[in-house]
Amino acid sequence: MKRRAVLKGAVAGAAALAMPHVARAQGRAKLGFLTWNIADQEALFKEEIAEFQQTHKDVEIEWLDKKGTELPAFYQTQLVAGTAPDIVDLQGAIWVEYAAGGALLDLSPYLAKEPEVAKLYNGDYLSTWRYEGKTYLLPFYISKTLLYYNKTMFKEAGLGAPPTSFDELLAFSAKMAKGEKTGFLTLNFDWLYWPLFKMNGVELLSPDLKKPAFNTPQAAEVLEKLAKATDGGAINKISWTGRWVEPNGAFAGDTVGMFHAHSSAYFFVKGQGRWINPDTLGATQLPGYWATPTNHGFAISKSCKHPELAWEFIKLLTGNKWATEFARRRKLLTGTVEADRAELATIAKEDPLGAAVLQTQLEHTDKFTGNWPLPYDAQLKDVFWPEIQNAVLGRKPAKTALADAERGVERLLRRRA
């Protein structure tokens, strides 16, 4: 659903004299503010805008929300038309393409000028928005993959603690596979499956990101094991064919032993799975502690006519006060250290299991993978993923699929060189 809110500050000479220098210098200004599929927070945004206008009385802020399926095309159209919103909420790796194309403002000079701002945020998450040594976004909300496991199914299969290696993960999955039940399920979009390869020492690209590095005996072995486990029912085939609703629904159905997904899945699954409580659901790290982040952050369009004002506004949005309030209302983590500490303390009292899930998001944040800063990330996925599907679903031998993927990736990299 599209929502639009315009809040205007009054123009008054006496008030203008009391305004900060940045607002006086800009005169009457307008900022466009675009968010990604979060229209349910309209009340929060109105409150934040109202507070901002208390000290920036000549500023008008127009807020617009777009669904995730609509925002990228909308933003691209606005960029081409020269009417890009000044502040934009971007998810995943899509921001890299915009940064590389010169559409986003480099925030590094602002962070260097105000070093105390960077200290507000989790450094590992903040670093995920660096491209060629420059930082382009501030954190809005954060999430990374973890391993959920069905304690009841573990007990029925004679299993105790969660798996500690890839081979154990597959072995545990096989033990739980019986009838309609399967042992393991993973999300696959936005490289969320990549930790399964990383824990086996497989790299997608060379360190300089200029050559494919995945066509190795180790990668072939991983694919062969995944294909065998999928064919035998240990791994649920929805891992390779579903996207979001289908995998979450399958795990909520109480017939899957383990689910590799990010923290956002918890509340979706909990809403559907009556069986879910602290005695039946566990949350832990995947073996090797590798995880793929899928974050939202605020960027400033380079075409912004009032970048100083936009910077002040995103500082307000991501500062301790409003990040804490957002975390409380949405029951998530923001990447703002104090806000996340407060939210964990609050949710631990209301939902201990939810707190355990969120706690994993702040652990081992030095082990991110699948988040390469590539301007051609979408094209790379389009070339690579179909061959992974072919291998794990038994359509092609692993070595053939890897060779075909390698040729496709090489062509893409040559075009992008």
Report residues per predicted region.
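Hinge/lid segment of periplasmic solute-binding proteins
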Residues: 92-144, 170, 218, 278-283, ...
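Extracytoplasmic "Venus flytrap"/periplasmic binding protein-like
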Residues: 47, 51-121, 152-164, 249-258, ...
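Glycine-centered hinge/linker elements that transmit conformational signals in sensory
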Residues: 173-175, 211-240
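Extracytoplasmic/periplasmic substrate-recognition and gating elements
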Residues: 27, 50, 54-55, 155-157, ...
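N-terminal export signals
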Residues: 5-25
